[in-house]
Amino acid sequence: MRQEHKKLLRLVITALLVALVFCGSKIEVVLPLSVGGYSRFHLGNIMCALSGILLGPWWGGLAAGLGSALYDCTNVLYITEAPITFVTKGLYGVIAGAVFVAVFRRKATYPAMAVSTVCAAVSYIIIYLAKTFFYNSMLLEGMSASAAWVATVLKVPSSLFNGGVAIVLAPLLAFAVLRALRMARLDDALNPSEK
């Protein structure tokens, strides 16, 4: 495959993953909370990890961040957080991709992809809960530290669920997609150096 075709295919796959992250974030169940507003279960984190595994840290992070930020821009509950979401969800893809590329050398096995997703999910949960405590609860809503702590703790179950689902499903999807791309001889576009 010529270099121009590889670049174009990588761009197309990146755009497709932006759309999948967006759609995965739309598939949600919003839960009202007694303190701190709301929480939600969604499938966006699966696609963020998938983006990092398939595209590597930089392109995968871009797809994860952009798809998630676009979702935030379409929802009045989250529109003000779109720039923060771009960074935090982008980091989800960057971490999944960095672990998969640097540690596992893109070895397409379920354990390698699962460990990459675990690292990304745990990192994201910590970042998300810290953002919830400091930014959402204390800064925006003016809560005391104890009320902010309660609001943050109420978001732990949905965060763990979203992370757990991503840990199970993202590697399975990545394995299937990589296999299909390999059979179609299109996997070359995913493996060039991160330029």
Model-derived regions, located:
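Loop-helix junctions at membrane interfaces
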Residues: 1-195
